[in-house]
Every structure is written in structure tokens, then in C-alpha cells.
């Protein structure tokens, strides 16, 4: 078994909506990013890549490459997952924690789980997504941006 941890953060800027966990969420602010700014899928992709010792999302999909400008993070996750499977790993489970004062994530979490399970080809029981605030402390608490942490467990695939 191998464990990976991922973290991502994006500042608010411009107009919404935002995309978190593959879900388009109405919000007056957008997220500043080279891709679609999906902090949940970026953190998850990093956790999976880390568990497989395949580097990180910035190495695979550099923000200096114009090909990834505005990229759909679900596509990036699926490509990373293909590489991880090619290395002989299967999914144990993933756990994602979104850190945001606003907007409220709870109504969107079921669809996030559906999208992540689809992208990883796994059962929804293998995907957990939750959200928390920082009780108005720090940059997320002041409403300056959104952060996310993710943990992934990989197991050697059986043939």
C-alpha cells in the first residue's frame, strides 16, 4: 500500500462561477488559475501522483504550458490516473477536504463524489469529500480564496 497527500490553494479573483470537484458552483467571485482552478481535483491529483511516486500536477501539466490554459481538471485527473494504473496501481480510497468560508460546499458534495468516482473508475464508497471552514481565520476565513487537502491510498493491482 502507498499513501499520497495533496494540497492546493487558489485566490479569488474575477467573476464566478467556480469549479470544485468538477462541479460548477454559482458564486460571485471566480478563482485565479492557469487551468479551471479546481482546488479539489488538483489536490486529489497531487495525492494520487504522490502515492505512485510520479511527481506532482505541476510536473505533469505545467502552468507554463499554453496547452493547459483553462484546462478541465477532470481531464487532468483522468490522465494522471491512466499513468498511475500503467504503473500497476489500483485505488484503495481517497479522502478530500475542501477548506472555504464561502460558498457553502455541502449541497455540491454528492455530485463531486459522483464525478470523482467516474473519473477514477471506482465505487462511490471509495471516495469521500467533505468541507470545513477555518472559523473566519486565515486567508480562507477572510474570503480571499479556497484551499483543499487530499489523501489517497493506492494498492498494487492484481492481475
Curated annotation (Swiss-Prot):
InterPro entries: MECDP_synthase, MECDP_synthase_CS, MECDP_synthase_sf. Pfam families: YgbB. Its EC number is 4.6.1.12. Its cofactor is a divalent metal cation. One of its GO terms (biological process) is terpenoid biosynthetic process. The keyword Metal-binding applies. Belongs to the IspF family. Involved in the biosynthesis of isopentenyl diphosphate (IPP) and dimethylallyl diphosphate (DMAPP), two major building blocks of isoprenoid compounds. Catalyzes the conversion of 4-diphosphocytidyl-2-C-methyl-D-erythritol 2-phosphate (CDP-ME2P) to 2-C-methyl-D-erythritol 2,4-cyclodiphosphate (ME-CPP) with a corresponding release of cytidine 5-monophosphate (CMP). Homotrimer. This is 2-C-methyl-D-erythritol 2,4-cyclodiphosphate synthase. The lineage of its organism: Bacteria, Pseudomonadati, Pseudomonadota, Gammaproteobacteria, Enterobacterales.
